[in-house]
């Protein structure tokens, strides 16, 4: 006999805590039995072909068709254990849940991420002019323009530089080897940027205003022009000069 099935004698005295606990257990047991009975009836109403679990226990195992018996029992157990919808609800009444109206890649904060937040860029600020730099080395070189610090000095002539690469380029001056040579005149230079500046001197169209143009020395002489062509050019030049000299000028009163 279960504890909650015992008969409690009536008394005029108030019930003890143990008796109250037994009554609560009995009430919960009845509610659980009612719930299981209602669920069993609902399953039978939806699919009457599904046998009850008690019938599964009583059925004998068919050893001749072992694989088929195992699959059928497993299928029946899954269908009986899986939750079913209430028979009062229909599929038309159930609407699909749409959490977002926009695609996932347009929703803020739901795009593709690398798994960690982007690190902010470091800023190195000059203490003299408040200029910002993204690398500490660039800030160090910049501050040397304010302090005029030149830690790299030449061991030949003693000239000092702010950057090590400038000292490296300077050392080419003391060497006979000049790796950057001009293809036109063959002159050698220590630095590539000096060669680029030198190449502009061979191009008359690229020289600056007022700067002397270095003529290009060519081994093959230029061909002589026909005397008739020279005479025509001279006549055109004279006529242009005479026209510009005798052209009427507009009076400012008009």
Swiss-Prot record:
A zinc finger (C2H2-type) spans 124-146, 152-174, 180-202. SUPFAM superfamilies: beta-beta-alpha zinc fingers. Keywords: Developmental protein, DNA-binding, Metal-binding, Nucleus, Repeat, Transcription, Transcription regulation, Zinc, Zinc-finger. InterPro entries: C2H2-ZF_Transcription_Reg, Znf_C2H2_sf, Znf_C2H2_type. Disruption phenotype: RNAi-mediated knockdown results in defects in feeding, and failed growth and development eventually leading to lethality at the late L1 to L2 stage of larval development. Morphological defects in the digestive tract, such as enlarged pharyngeal intestinal valve lumen, leading to functional defects including accumulation of ingested bacteria in the lumen of the posterior intestine and defective elimination from the anterior lumen of the intestine. One of its GO terms (molecular function) is zinc ion binding. It is found in: Nucleus. Gene3D superfamilies: Classic Zinc Finger. Pfam families: zf-C2H2. It comes from the Eukaryota. Belongs to the Odd C2H2-type zinc-finger protein family. This is Protein odd-skipped-related 2. The lineage of its organism: Eukaryota, Metazoa, Ecdysozoa, Nematoda, Chromadorea.
